Amino acid sequence: MNIKNEINSIIQNLNKKEFTKAITTCEKLIKKKIKHTVIFNLYGLAYQKQGMFLESIKAFEKSIELQNDNYLAINNLAVSFKSINENKLAEKFYQECLRLKPDHVIAIINYANLKEKINKFEDAIKLYFKALKFKKEVNEVYIFLKLSDLYLSIGNFEKAKDFAQRVVKINPDYVAGHVQLSKFINYKDDSKHLLQMEKLIQKKTPQNNEIMDLSFSLGAAYEAKKNYEKAFTFFNQGNNLRRKEIRYDLNDHIKLQTSIIKIFEDVKELNIIKEPFKSKIIFICGMPRSGTTLIEQIISSHKEVLATGENNFLSTYIKENYLDNFLLLQKKIMRDIYSKNYFFQDFVSRSLSEHNFESQVFTDKSVQNFLWIGFIKLFFPNSKIIVTDRNPRDICLSIFKINFKNGFMNFAYSQKDIAKFYKLYFDLINYWKKLYPKEIYTVKYENLIYDRVAETKKLINFCDLKWDPNCLRHDKNKSVIKTASVSQARKPIYKSSLNLSDNYSKYLKEMFSLLKN
């Protein structure tokens, strides 16, 4: 048997995405007692490419056991640990890989991605700059776009714009570069880039996803110029294209919400209280685009509070442990309510640690928080729950204008689905308020805009925090922001978004009429 030929055959399988074939070949060789570090590394890669990370970890560990300086396997092992949120182990192995091979560019970029994930943005930026030293081996456009995104998230708009401009200069037809650059241009006074995007969209074929991305950017540009008819035309085009590429059934959400209410109708009589969680979490709940990012920025401007953004720890645990086909598993939930175990709390605690969040008070504004308010009250009784409220028309318009990357937001690309989802949200929030009337604080976005000082003081008081004047300077907050609201949340509170939906009344009749009813 020629081992070299077998290895080449496995590599060909991987290149063709024939992962099952690659695994079968590796297993045949392993059964023949062939112990070869490369074979186990390829075995791990085949599993990794299929999302089977635990299996891949075993294979990579065996590869490293056979050759402890196999930096390729060590890098791959780090990737798998990162994929299952074992971020500290991932960091350990990236460091080991780069100790053995300091110029391993793929590991440098992977390590930068990990740093970004755990909110070490300054470290991520340094690593991307390190990767740029190897010009022949890196895709400069990819790294410049990453740097632009990172600088945007930490509020350095000047550098973010500079790197977006570099992307467009290198590749004038690269849509992602133009979409990024559009975030920094004031189209009221500048039409040059808008015309560039219009020329670019005409070059693209209708099947191309890039038309969708450009459509949302052009919609925002025309809105800035107060040309609402053209803005709507582009937003509508982007939504129609996005809707065609996703599968979404609102009935799945109805099924989940009905299941939630049924469970908590049974639970509410139990009067069971778990021990307080070791840290206080301030859960910010609300419809997307209702002001949750602004509220998090205000609260996390307090010297004692750390923002964790949309961390999704609650959703992850609930979906992995209590949910099956959009139905909650009542027996498992009841078992954990009655038991003395703290698996849920331990998972959240470890997740906070793995993502480098160290504080006694956190904010969590994950997009699905409003679904899990009952779980929050049961398992995190010392938490605070804030609900953001805003003109429903403005919320729904704002959703219509965004090309979200979050699968939970698949309702966002149809006027009818947006309005119906909002009504379901409204019903559930009212259910929670009746269930926990004294424990949910509602912040009205419009009140905050018109009476910032008084509303901010009431908000901080509800959180049982001492007054900190920094909370009135949220635009100076250096917390990382990873959501679509990043630009607005970095600015002082502004009134321009109030009742913006009035400008779209004749274009969004379907959505607004459903909201009325």
Where are the predicted features?
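Phosphate-binding active sites in nucleotide-utilizing proteins
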Residues: 274-380
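Conserved phosphate-donor/acceptor-positioning beta-strand/loop module used by diverse small-molecule
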Residues: 376-399
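Short coil turns that delineate tetratricopeptide repeat
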Residues: 34, 68, 102, 136-138, ...
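PAPS-dependent sulfotransferases, especially Golgi type II membrane carbohydrate sulfotransferases
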Residues: 163, 182, 194-206, 214-282, ...
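Register position in tetratricopeptide repeats
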Residues: 15, 49, 83-84, 117-118, ...
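Conserved alpha-helical positions within TPR/SEL1-like repeat arrays
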Residues: 11, 38-49, 72-83, 106-116, ...
